[in-house]
Amino acid sequence: MVFSTIIFLFRFLPITLALYYLAPAKLKNTVLFLCSLVFYCWGEVRFFPVMVALILINYISGLCIEHFDQKPALRRTFLLIALIGSLGMLFYFKYANFVLRSANALLGTAFAEIQGIGTLPLGISFYTFQTLSYSIDVYRRDVKAERNIIDFGAYVVMFPQLIAGPIVKYRDVSNQLHVYRHRYSLQQLEEGMTLFTFGLAKKVLLADAIGALWTDIIGVADSPSTTFVGLANASTPLVWLGIIAYSLQLYFDFSGYSMMGIGMGKMLGFDFPANFNYPYISASITEFWRRWHMTLSGWFREYVYIPLGGNRKGLKRQIFNLFVVELLTGIWHGANWNFICWGLYYFVLLAVEKLFLLPHLQKGKVWPHIYTLFLVVVGWAMFVGNDTGVSFGLLFQKLFIPSGGVSPLYFLRNYGVLLVVSILCCTPLIEKIWNLLKKNAVTRCAAILALLVVSTAYVVGSTNSPFLYFNF
């Protein structure tokens, strides 16, 4: 089920909120757990056993880790069970056939692919990392093991952040899970509705609209557009315009989903961590990764980079640790070589900055922003290079070897205003304007209501457009 659909906006969300608010205090987590399971099973009920297994493995492992507190060997054994169980399911569904295909291509073997896997369980990369963080934190004694399986299940399967984040650590919400009274307030409800509305607007008014420009240029086979060009016919300037549009689409799509999730969390009385902080205003690649998908970066920093030694064991070890993290970041995003190359690309950029470039970037004013945006956009070209209708080699040939073809002028005339608005929305300017407007209650309510009505009208009048990060 997608947030930006009629069935979610007009049926699932209002019914769930009504049941949740009306439920007795001690049953709220039960209502949240059951409604979230309905949400998860709506599209692919066959993956219900996967979710149940993941919950049980980590729930039981957490209890056993805590129970055998004075027996280190048993604690490590149950942590290993949680890690192997969680990562094993992720590997089976997401990476097994990729490994088999790669082995066949590289080694000349003839391993048969696993039949019946089909589509990837929605959000498996996100909720697997959540359960891993829980089991590791219990092992580290950072949190107490959750003894109520319903409360633990509600944490794992909580629908606002289940499918595409933000990645929420158990310790971020453990107190809120157990505060049955006064969990939410009218102020929280208003803040949540505001965030949800802004996120919905990002998705349907910006991401989907600017994404149409990219679709018109590459000309995917199932595109409803009759004006698409096709990558082979596009000129180099037009391809650059298209990849810039894709960069904007990806940001608004993913940050919009995260904002909607954070907003719904507030409606339910939970404070989820922020996931984006205007990444396209960054003045270095290092800063970009502090602003983009912050919960994923934070997860790798806490559970991989620091345990490997972080910055504490010399420069060579620091670079190696960075290599491991960026490689895993690429692999996390997808079972394909372009994602691995994308991760290694960022490793090289981050290593160069760490070795010598960062001090020079910190002295600059304008050129560091240009440098960062250029490299990020090139990275997104690598990222999208495996999508349907996109030839990785042809895309980079068009980007870096000047070629003629269809001019971008037609598309600039049609999408120029949208491009300008989208670029402005990548900066804190809109937030500053909103901070001025929201001081007046009437203006604040009118603005949110108008934005919600317009966004909802677009949802009603458009076809279903899934979030891009559902693929990961």
Which residues are covered by each model-predicted region?
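Membrane-embedded transmembrane alpha-helical bundles that form the catalytic cores
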Residues: M1-N471
